[in-house]
Amino acid sequence: MQFIEVKNAIKLLKNPKQNIAFLDIRERKQYVQGFAFGTINCPLSKFKTTIKDLVPDQSTAILFIGIKNTAQTIKVGRITKSLNYKNVFQIEGDYKKWKKEKLPIWAGEYTFSKAFGEWIEITSEVKNLFPKQLKKIHQKPNNYLQIDARPKKEFEKFTLPNSVQCSGGELPCFINNQTNLKKDYIVHCAGRTRSIVAYQTLKDFNFKNEKYVLNGGTQNWVLNGYDRDFKNKSKIKSTKLNFKSDLNLANQIAKKFNIPKSSQKNKNHSCHYFQLNSEIKNFKKIKGWKQVNATTLVQNTDKFIASTKTKIFIFSNIPTSAVFATIWLRRMGYNAIWQIKNPRSFKKSYSITKPDPTYFFPKRHLGNKSHSRGYLNWEHSLIPTIRKWGCKQPWVSANQNNLRDVKHTIYKVYKNF
């Protein structure tokens, strides 16, 4: 592993031709309190298994920060060498030098995806509904389908009165039937990002019905003095699948956004391969493909992907779900590709990706109003922070249909330094 001066690290980070992974090896609890923009957390305690998943291409230029002593330098160097990574650099002076040079630092959990969600709200012109308005809607007959866009496990811990559950990646399939097409829609999550993604997805897939986002989700509901529902049971498995109709819709939307497709059978171990889990129906798992919920892949992207240009193949037995994930990853600047045919299994193993403990405003989902308010204010601060760094267009507009060409935000931010 080579040392690299900060100024030369910035040259790498602003070069759009360079496939780069910027990794912070500190433990999660410390990392979320403040980290260099664009860094992905790869904690030293589970470094070897995590880096293989985050950076499958051994030729990727890897920048390390958060290394506190010689022993850690030696350990990181030894492991990366054993895994045959070829371009590995440690930033000289680490965070002390980074801060001295006034280079971009922010904080939080899944911050890149959260900021992206805020950008989508701005450029999509999302229609917001507020808790007091929703409470009034609940008090009289209405034609709204109120959808909690989080995965089943989260929904069953707590949700809002009158909500049904459908994770955002399966919304097109869930909506595209005679019953639900006659409804208008209110989407929510626990905060903001996944409901914004769900709202835009309804627009992306050409559902013309009236639609709203519950501003601030369950956290804002609690802040307004209303009670959540607990221990609900999702009925998502009762959704009837029409594969032909779903495939037709998927092809129509893939054409609309000009997203790349693949039917390749030979696997290159230097790429990402994701098979999207369905909560509607259990499908056979394909060996060599990492299993993930589509919405989680978009919401918690930095748990799965660190490289800026590595190819990402997306497969789902529900075609609209694969198109959903491909669209969103490409909007974020990743090189995602829709795998249109059932892929062959191959030999590739992955570590189990477990949810992290909540360290950032940790009591926000436990009814703590101070933490909820602080968290929502933090989300609102993300785009102003990026703009303060001189980056006015960190991602493409939500209204841009042509997603053939993509560029990662890391290049757009660091070109200003």
What role is predicted for each listed range?
Residues 1-21, 25-145, 149-270, 276-417:
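Rhodanese-like catalytic fold shared by cysteine-dependent sulfurtransferases
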